[in-house]
Amino acid sequence: FYMTIFLIAEVTAVSLLMNYISGTDLWITSLIIISTSLGYTLYGGLRASIYTDNIQFLAMIILLSVAFYYIIYSGSENYSFEFVNKINPNLLSTGYLPNITAGLTFFIAVAATNLFHQGNWQRVYAAKSSKILKKSLFISFLIIIPIVFFMGFTGLVAISENQEVIPDLAFFYILLKEQVLIISILIIILAISLTVSSIDTLINAISSLIIVDGNSIFKSKGNYFKYSKYIIIILSLIAFIVSSKGFSILYLFLLADLLCCSAVLTVFFSFYKKSINQSNASLSIIIGLFFGLMFFPSPDFSKSILIGFLLPSDIFPEFLSQSLLFSSFFLATFAPLLAWKINKMI
């Protein structure tokens, strides 16, 4: 489920970007991206995906280098923390509670969801040796820190310059606001290559799950390799239809994050705690998902099922009503502990 949402969000992201730059209809970009990815991934499999990862990394470095150069040498005084602090001082305040809860929220979400990303585990087991794997992870760790910092900085600048900026396109808003043709063309090429490479990883990941789990779960021994291709095509059609609607990418990810948060402790602790059986694991995940959904915010982040819908918001502490997403993810992650306690009592 998470990887299907991820697939939809990836296609939606590049479709929105193309629409933002050139006005291209969402469905046209979605069709091109999905068709291209399926065309070589269903044939080349994991080898093709790993090969395109090299292209993806190169494209990412070029894109970030162009962005960094553009910001540094643009001459604008807006690209500084002083500007952000002047316009929106709360964004840089360590005493502003939403800053802390937002950071914790996305830490929980990213940690939980990536543990369920089969594409990551495929890369782990495809490594030639443990030594190479450790070296790769360490280098990736060093690379990703400045990238996340830079992307976060551009987001702060974008929202400070324009309160109406689309959050999903904040980074590209910075690069495209001057409407420089060569930069627009470069972004289109690099963004498409990045998206296609990410999508092929997801397609391979979903396909491998169908093959492995199909053989282990179902008693009938069918050709799950063949079945996986059919299922991938069906999921791609769903991704095409949904991405053509242009729904919020962030909200799609958050829905998938919620499910992963509700399952992460149960799934991984069950590897070590023999007391967590199948029925107890299912109950734990359901409890986590229930509590998470009760606090999961609406698309405008103003209310949730419990706060603002079933019960008025003013009877709850202000902390809860202002931190619905954090409360949702926190409860979804740790509420399954209740099921473990109940199981011990029984």
Where are the regions a protein language model picked out?
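Membrane-embedded helix-loop-helix hairpins and adjacent transmembrane boundary segments
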Residues: F1-I346
